[in-house]
Curated annotation (Swiss-Prot):
Gene3D superfamilies in the record: Ribosomal protein L14
NCBIfam families per record: rplN_bact
Chief localisation class: plastid
Disulfide bond annotation, renumbered to this chain: none
Protein name: Large ribosomal subunit protein uL14c
Family statement: Belongs to the universal ribosomal protein uL14 family.
Recorded GO CC terms: cytosolic large ribosomal subunit; organellar chromatophore; plastid
Gene from which this protein is expressed: rpl14
Role, per record: Binds to 23S rRNA.
Amino acid sequence: MIQQETFLNVADNSGAKRIQCIRVLGSNRRYAHVGDIIVAAVKDAMPNMSVKKSDVVKAVIVRTKATLRRETGNSIRFDDNAAVIINDDKNPKGTRVFGPVARELRERNFTKIVSLAPEVI
C-alpha cells in the first residue's frame, strides 16, 4: 500500500531514480495499489535527462511490497515499491521498463507499460 510520503523506486529510464508520493489520485483515497496513479515529487535523478530533481510528475504503481490478492486465490508480493512515470496520455515517459510488473496493469489499460516490461507476473 502506497500513501502520502512513501518513497518509491522508478522502474523506467526517464531519468528519475526515486520519487516520493504527494497524492493518491481518486476520490478521497488514502492508499494506492498496483495500477493506481499517484502524483509524486522526484527526489533523486540522473543528470542530463528529461526528468529533473524536484519535478512533480504522475506515475503508475507497478510493484508493491504489500501482498496483492488475485481473484483466483493466489497472492503475489514484490521485493520493492516501484512506479513508472507517465505523461497526461497515460503513456510512459521512458522507453524501457526495468524489472517485473503485475498482470493487473493490462486490465487497467496500461498496455504500453506491459509490452515494454521484460516480465509480467
